[in-house]
Structure formats: C-alpha cells, structure tokens
Amino acid sequence: MVESSKQNLDALKDEYKSVQRGYLPKLDAGASYSINEHEYPNNPKKRANAYGSINYMLYDGGKKYDIYDGYETNIKSGEKSLDALKNNLSLTVIQYYFDYLSLEAKKDAKQKEIEQLTAQEDRIGRFYNAGTTTEDELQKIVSRLQNAIVELQEIELNIITITHNLEYITGTQVSIKDGSKLEDINNLIQKNPRFDIQALDFVTQSKQSVAQAQKSGYYPTVTLDNTFNYYDSNYDNSTFKDPNNHQNIASANMKWNLFSFGQTKYQYESKQKEYLASRSNFEYEKNKADVDLQLALKSYNIAKAKIKSTEATLKAAQSAYEIIKSKFENGLIDNVAFLQSLTEKYDAISQHKKAINDLEVKKATIIYHSGEKLQEYIRW
C-alpha cells in the first residue's frame, strides 16, 4: 500500500515536470522530397525541402501559473496522504501489538487458572475415591476445567489471528516481544491537523487553482514563432529556376476569443462549484477531526482511571482468593465459592494488564489525531 502510494506520487511529480517543460520553447525539424508529373514555375519537377521551427507560448491568459499551483498543491496533498497512510498503518499495528500483549496476559492468567483447577481436580478426585466427597463436587471442578481449556484455545486463536494480520500489513514474518511503549503525551501540543485533513486541505486548494485557470479564457494568448525553410528545386526548364533557395519567417501571433456563448463562464462556474463543495467537505472533516481528538483525550483520562480501578480490583480479588482457598481446602466452604474466587482472581489479573495496554493505545490515538508521526513516539 505504501509503495503503491509512493509510485502514484512520483508519477504525479513526473507529470508536473512534463507540464512545465511544455511551456518551454519547442524546436521542430522536418524534411520532404517530391516528384511532380507536370512542371510549373512554382512547381518544379523535383523538390527537396528541409525546415526548422521554434515556437514559444509567451502568454496564455495566466493559465500556466494556476496550473502550476494546482499541481504543487496536488503533490503536497499526495505527500500528506502518504503520511496519513503510514500513520494509519502505524496506529493499526500499535493496536494489534497491545491487543496481542493483552491476549498474552489473558492466556498466561488462564493457564495458571487451569493449573489451579487441575490441582484441585486431583485433590477432590482423591477425596471422591476415598468416599469423603460427592461426585457432583468433583464434576463441578471438571466442568470448570474443561471450560477454561476451551477459553484458552479461543485466546490462542485470537493471538494467531493478530499475528497473521500483522504479517499481512507488514509483508514480513513477525515476532512480537513485550517492552515497547509510547512516549508520555502530557506535554503534547497539537500543532497541525491530522495528516488526512491536511491532504484534504491541499486538494481543496488545488480545485481552487483549477477554477481560476478557467478564467484564462477571457484573456488573449500570445505566441512567438520562427520558421526557416531550405528548398532544393530541380527544374527541367531552366527559365523557371528561382535564385532564392531559403526562406525565414518570424511572427508574433495573438488570439483572443471575444465570444463563445458563455463557454468560459460555465467552465469557471463548474470548477468553482467543485471547489466550494470540496471546501465544505474539508470544513466538515476538520470539525469532525477536532471532535475525534477531544473524544480521544477523554478516553485517555478514562483509561488512566481504569488502571487504578483494575489495580484495586486485583488486590481485592487476590486477597479474597487466598482466604477462600484456605477455607475451601479445610472444608469450611463448598467449591462454588472457591471456583468463583479463582475465576475473579485471574480475570482481575488479565483485566489489569489489559487496562495498562489499552492506555498505550489511547496515547497512540491522541498522537494520531494531533497530526504527529506515531513512529517518532515509539520507544523500543
């Protein structure tokens, strides 16, 4: 995707160079040879002709500079679109990366839960074989263990899916390791709109230049021409011979369209309306982007609060689990309370780690909406 956008941008730059070269003087050359059936004073039996001409558009009604402005803003738009694409991909990769870490934390918690359930299955199984507990007590543990195993498989599938998605985006095999974070954004100041909004602004400016270029139809065009011809005439009748064998013609030409049934007017109005439509769309998208940034800032503050909340939940769940586990193993409570406490403990562990990872995604979202390059904020 990025390489394709680069190629399109390079193609636009080459096209602009071609247009610029088109306004430079043009030099042409040509030659001809003819044999006529009948000979006349101005029509020899045989004639060879060679010519060279130079042509220059001195003035085109001001259209040239509007065309130049249009190409330059289109190129700037292409550059910002490329930055927007890179930033979009960076944000997507960051989201996948921290989702992957959250799933790995969830997987680790689930594996530890399975270890605890397996140990309790063995313990209750021994009591059941000894006749000191009922079968339903054992089956509750077995059922919870099987559910945990299925949940682990689902987590592993989600991890594989993220890995494949990252490989699709990057085009290479990926190996994900923990440790990457984003720089602190407390001092981040929005200097520019989002890259796609900047690109849209340049597109709008380009349409304005195209509209202005239509006004050139109201003004004359002036060209300068110089043509040199060389003749080699071969007459059978020597009285027809002309002593002159060359001719040079220099001319200055002006063309001014005085009336065209409103063609120029309607061309301008058409392009002007396209510009106004683009300007309206730009203002809408710009306002929407401002709202997106404000929402991202609020989400970031909520994410910070969620970390504190999940941390408190985790401490409570761990404390409750240790107490309930001790009571359960001493036969003071049934396994329903124990299983509930076990699930809450490991859910709290994974939720806390997920909250930490989600905060990094929220930071990335703010950087993205602030018109900054995400790659410059990643700490490996």
Protein language model regions, located:
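Acidic, low-complexity, intrinsically disordered peripheral segments
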Residues: 351-380
